[in-house]
Design a protein with these regions (language model features):
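Conserved donor NDP-sugar-binding/catalytic core segment of glycosyltransferases
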Residues: 105-119
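The conserved acidic donor/metal-binding loop of glycosyltransferases
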Residues: 97-101
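Acidic donor-diphosphate engagement hotspot in glycosyltransferases and nucleotidyltransferases
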Residues: 81, 102-107
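Short aromatic/hydrophobic "clamp" motif used to bind/position activated sugar donors
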Residues: 93
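Short beta-strand/loop segment that forms part of the nucleotide-sugar
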Residues: 39-50, 69-71
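Short, acidic, metal-binding catalytic loop of nucleotide-sugar glycosyltransferases
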Residues: 27-39
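Glycine-rich, basic loop-to-helix element that forms the pyrophosphate-binding segment
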Residues: 71-88
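Cell-envelope/extracellular polymer assembly enzymes that use nucleotide-activated donors
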Residues: 6-10, 41
Length: 119
């Protein structure tokens, strides 16, 4: 584990076969980047889907520290989240889905909470 005041964001994805996937995914990633240095890494655990893999591998994460993990088993949200936590390097994690966005102040007070709850 690294700095105890950083957060790993876990993003499990089952499929890209949603009509608005690319737009949702882009907005989600931008909302993560807007959190600043508090987010140390983005861990994407995605299902073995060629369309999804093509999109993720061609996406410009623009300097965001990204770990990619292909989930080969039957899609299972909880197992994908657990795998993301296993390979994350921060003491703190946050979960987001591809069709969600963090508000610009989502992690604003996180440093205060991390100071209080060090363990």
């Amino acid at each position: 584990m690294e700095n105890n005041k950083t957060i790993s964001v876990i993003l499990p994805i089952k499929t890209a076969r949603s009509a608005d996937f690319e737009d949702f995914f882009d907005r989600c990633i931008k909302s993560i980047k807007n959190q600043g240095e508090t987010v140390s890494e983005l861990v994407i655990v995605y299902c073995d889907d060629s369309l999804l893999e093509t999109h993720i591998n061609s996406y410009d994460f623009d300097g965001l520290n990204v770990k990619l993990e292909v989930w080969k088993d039957e899609p299972n949200f909880a197992n994908q989240v657990n795998r993301g936590v296993e390979i994350s390097t921060s003491n703190w994690v946050s979960l987001i889905e591809f069709d969600d966005e963090y508000s610009n102040i989502w992690f604003k007070n996180s440093q205060k909470y991390m100071d209080i709850y060090k363990d």
